[in-house]
Amino acid sequence: MISDINALKYKALKYKKVLLKVSGEALMGDKQFGHEYDIIKKIAIDIKEVIALGVEVAIVVGGGNIYRGINAALVGMDRASADYIGMLATVINALTLQNVMESLNIYTRVLSAIPMMSVCEPYIRRKAKRHMEKKRVVIFAGGTGNPFCTTDSAAVLRAIEMNCDILLKATQVDGVYDSDPKKNPDAKKYFTISYKDVITNNLQVMDTAAIAVARENKLPIRVFSIKEQGNFARVIQDKGEYTAIEE
């Protein structure tokens, strides 16, 4: 149920159907590997706050906290095989996030691009849209189901397929910078940047293919920090700290 106050906020919202991309690294917090459950619970609470506004939410999770296919390929592993292992890592993350969210009474469904009938539903576009219409949070796992494609590309594709109003990328920093702010204290933050400039300046916020597809389909992107509680709800209301990527 949406409260009267949240119903008024919903009417004022510009974005009523959103896709949240959560990187694997965001799930491990300050650890070097695996999951930081306090961080995952914080993310789940943020999602619950957005759902309370009446917003339909979909999520794409990465797998970099467990396995990175591109890194394995660099040391000699077959790239396609490495990418498939990375896709399996996203399923682990999706199931972990689902369990934490369900402990907070958030109705959640995991849909995987790689069929795993005993643990989650296969990805079917119409089924995913129906889940969202019923106000269930849909977590997309398995990337695109194809090697050589990043989970950023999966996020853009799923956002477009679900007719989302916007894609929000949750990271460990509060936006897009011209260099790594963790390594360069003088890094410049972009508050607004075009798709073209992201590609031209080779900014590493998302891969080129993902940005190109977002640009072609006029899908706006917001990049923000997941570390600060309540940021997700603020960003979809055009508040808080973030970088806007659009035409």
UniProtKB/Swiss-Prot annotation:
Its main location: cytoplasm. Inhibited by UTP. ATP binds at residues 21-24, 64, 68, 171-172, 177, 180. Keywords: ATP-binding, Cytoplasm, Kinase, Nucleotide-binding, Pyrimidine biosynthesis, Transferase. One of its GO terms (cellular component) is cytosol. CDD domains: AAK_UMPK-PyrH-Ec. UMP binds at residues 63, 83, 144-151. Coiled coil: none annotated. Its EC number is 2.7.4.22. The keyword Heme does not apply. It catalyses: UMP + ATP = UDP + ADP. GO terms for molecular function: ATP binding; UMP kinase activity. Catalyzes the reversible phosphorylation of UMP to UDP. Homohexamer. HAMAP family: PyrH_B (MF_01220_B). This is Uridylate kinase. It comes from Rickettsia rickettsii (strain Sheila Smith). The lineage of its organism: Bacteria, Pseudomonadati, Pseudomonadota, Alphaproteobacteria, Rickettsiales.
